[in-house]
Amino acid sequence: MKLLLLGDLHFSLKSSSSRVDSIVEEFLYRFKDLRDKIAENGIMAVICTGDIFNTPYQSPETIFKLSKEIESLGVPFITAIGNHDEIGYRLENWQTQTSLGILKKITKNLHISDMYLGEDFTASFQHFIPEVDTETNGKYLSYYSESKVDNYLIHVVHGYMVSGKLPFHVVNPSEIADTNADFVLAGHYHKPVYEKIGNKMFYNPGSFANLTYDDKDRICEVGLLDTSTNALERLSVPYDKGTWVIKTDTKFKKKELILEETIVETDSVALITQIAKNKQLQADTIERYWEVQNGE
């Protein structure tokens, strides 16, 4: 069976402060490309890594617009729950208090659960929890499926699975190479990641949206997975890069410099201590740090 693998969606009708154009047209163009890829390749389902919306509270217009786009794909849309889909990083509130809960109720082909049983594959999900990337007794348990199936197993995790190092803690594919899944699909981090270790694949397509100025030149991609042959094809998603602006005022540059000096700290406790002592660091800069820390 052929599946389309999609990174964090971050759907919104509002452009970021770095853009002067409308992000809506870009989203709609990308969904059209998804429909074309589904038709051309005989795709039977889409699996997404979460962060369906950019924030947990969205307008009715935004919710209905995304519902229409998901239903237009014509195949099951199966997703994890990301940190942007939750309130206060609490997984239990998504159904009753968030826009994702409303979207689920009105979108016929949207599937959200801990496990999805496909025709010849099983998808298990580790939705976002604050301890998703925490090591326990030498293992990163969130990257191991609790499913006991005989068919092709895809484990979807909304967590920082990254090749190499970052200024904050991440999980390297080599650290979870003995996972019981055939394929680990991760989100949260917005740049593509791919490694194959033995017969197992570890993949993050990267975010479906280019939300920040630093991310403006990244080419969006999706994965085409054939579960019958365990083969992955990475496909680019063409789009209009949009119109971006650079904030060049002195105040912004000073805050940017302070943040750059501060983020060198890799220990979160030390970092927050430094922030607390630094009177020059404005609230919006602190907020931006946490956005970076949480993959936003």
What are these regions (language model features)?
Residues 166-234:
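Conserved beta-sheet core of the metallophosphoesterase superfamily
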Residues 15-17, 50-69, 86-106, 125, ...:
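Metal-dependent catalytic neighborhoods of phosphoester/phosphodiester hydrolases
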Residues 81, 85-175:
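Conserved catalytic scaffold of divalent metal-dependent phosphoesterases
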Residues 5-7, 45-51, 77-84, 111-115, ...:
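Active-site neighborhood of phospho(di)ester-bond hydrolases with catalytic His/Asp-centered motifs
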Residues 65-74, 171-179:
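Catalytic-core regions built around general acid/base machinery
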Residues 10-13, 54-57, 83-91, 116-119, ...:
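Active-site environment of divalent metal-dependent phosphoester hydrolases
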Residues 1-65, 140-149, 296:
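N-terminal active-site segment of His-dependent metallophosphoesterases
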Residues 241-296:
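Non-catalytic terminal accessory segments
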